[in-house]
């Protein structure tokens, strides 16, 4: 599952929040022990893995040691866009999506075993199995 955000938006958010500019020319990934430097062009993609749904929160694990400062800003940006505090950071690599303010979504998801969640810039795909 990938979350992609235009790079200039990340720069603007961090500059506004922290009063400093951020210039990242590449992100380093460790893939099978091989260090790969990936240039940033247009979008910054955060790789996350669906962990679980406890009836109130969906937990997503960040993959590939995503830059911590950017993730903190991502959480703030998503919450501001939605107008509610639904996204939080738990530990070093877990994003928590709170559904408490969306009881109809909780009611729907509790009837199913959520196996996977995948989303891109245009859609949200949830793989559900009846309990």
Please place each PLM-identified region on the residue numbering.
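Extracellular/lumenal and peripheral-membrane lipid-interaction modules
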Residues: 1-131
């Amino acid at each position: 599952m990938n979350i992609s955000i235009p790079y200039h938006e990340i720069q603007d958010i961090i500059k506004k929040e922290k009063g400093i500019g951020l210039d990242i020319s590449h992100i380093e990934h460790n893939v099978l022990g091989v260090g790969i430097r990936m240039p940033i062009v247009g979008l910054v993609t955060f790789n996350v893995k669906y962990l679980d749904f406890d009836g109130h929160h969906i937990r997503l694990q960040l993959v590939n040691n995503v830059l911590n400062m950017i993730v903190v800003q991502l959480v703030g940006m998503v919450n501001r866009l939605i107008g509610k505090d639904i996204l939080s950071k738990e530990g070093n690599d877990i994003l928590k999506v709170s559904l408490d303010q969306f009881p109809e979504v909780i009611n729907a998801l509790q009837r199913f075993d959520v196996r996977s969640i995948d989303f891109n810039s245009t859609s949200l795909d949830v793989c559900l199995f009846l309990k």
